[in-house]
A protein has these predicted regions:
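Charged, low-complexity intrinsically disordered segments
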Residues: 1-254
Length: 254
């Protein structure tokens, strides 16, 4: 698949029918389906990696760093916070959000390819994450389940499943009426979502994160690399901690 074909695939709206596809939809870092961990999201802790000599504790912080990569003093200060942050949720809420007005004006031009590059570096640089991704069945459709998220990009990076949402909401009301506490209700919802109800409904959205993960997984399996647009990233002049990154190297997993 060439770079343009990959971009078209990446931004295409999808409708994954859970009744006919082997959907591995992740929402939380502790999700488990068919005995396999779904700790695949950017926010998940514990999968640190180096990106051209700079260590990040999680891929969310590395991704956000690209939005503030003009090399200005303000951007350097933000990046220093991101490098030491070990919590992707905190980075998004407490580091990115307050400085949203300072992000690069051309961010949307290269952010998808930057995410692909970041996740690929995570695959190359963290063996535990790499093996986790490779453990997902070959016929699985990896999906970011953002059904209960309200953000404008919920169905860009992820998907929504309205039928499953209704089932889970009805279950919550039923269990609440029985006097079950909030934590117990959530556990029961997760159990059904990842088990008996995993084949319910249709996941709709672009699912960029799921597609990027599947693309990286396939590259690892084939001993190749994803169709990263290195020319676009090089042209973006991405600076990290005072160093402009270069994108002319081809690296495979060890």
């Amino acid at each position: 698949m060439n770079i343009q074909d990959f971009y078209d695939f990446l931004v295409r709206e999808e409708a994954y029918d859970a009744s006919s596809l082997n959907c591995f939809a992740f929402r939380h870092g502790y999700d488990v389906r068919q005995g396999l961990s779904l700790s695949l999201g950017n926010m998940v802790r514990g999968f640190g990696f180096d990106l051209q000599g700079i260590h990040f504790h999680n891929s969310e912080c590395a991704y956000i760093a690209g939005a503030f990569s003009n090399g200005t003093d303000a951007h350097l200060a933000i990046q220093r916070q991101l490098v030491v942050c070990d919590n992707g949720y905190a980075a998004k809420k407490s580091i990115r959000k307050p400085y949203e007005s300072l992000k690069r004006s051309d961010w949307e031009r290269f952010n998808k390819q930057w995410m692909l590059y970041v996740v690929w570096q995570k695959c190359l640089g963290n063996g535990v994450f790499r093996n986790l991704l490779l453990s997902i069945p070959k016929d699985a459709v990896i999906i970011e389940d953002s059904t209960f998220q309200r953000g404008s990009t919920a169905t860009v990076w992820g998907t929504r499943n309205d039928e499953l949402k209704k089932r889970l909401n009805d279950l919550r009301k039923e269990l609440k009426a029985q006097g079950m506490c909030k934590a117990a209700i959530k556990r029961e919802q997760d159990k059904m979502r990842l088990g008996e109800w995993a084949t319910i409904g249709v996941f709709k959205g672009q699912n960029l994160m799921g597609k990027i993960l599947m693309t990286c997984k396939q590259a690892l399996e084939q001993g190749t690399e994803p169709p990263i647009d290195y020319a676009l990233l090089q042209d973006a002049h991405i600076n990290l901690l005072g160093k402009e990154l270069t994108f002319n190297q081809y690296v495979k997993a060890a």
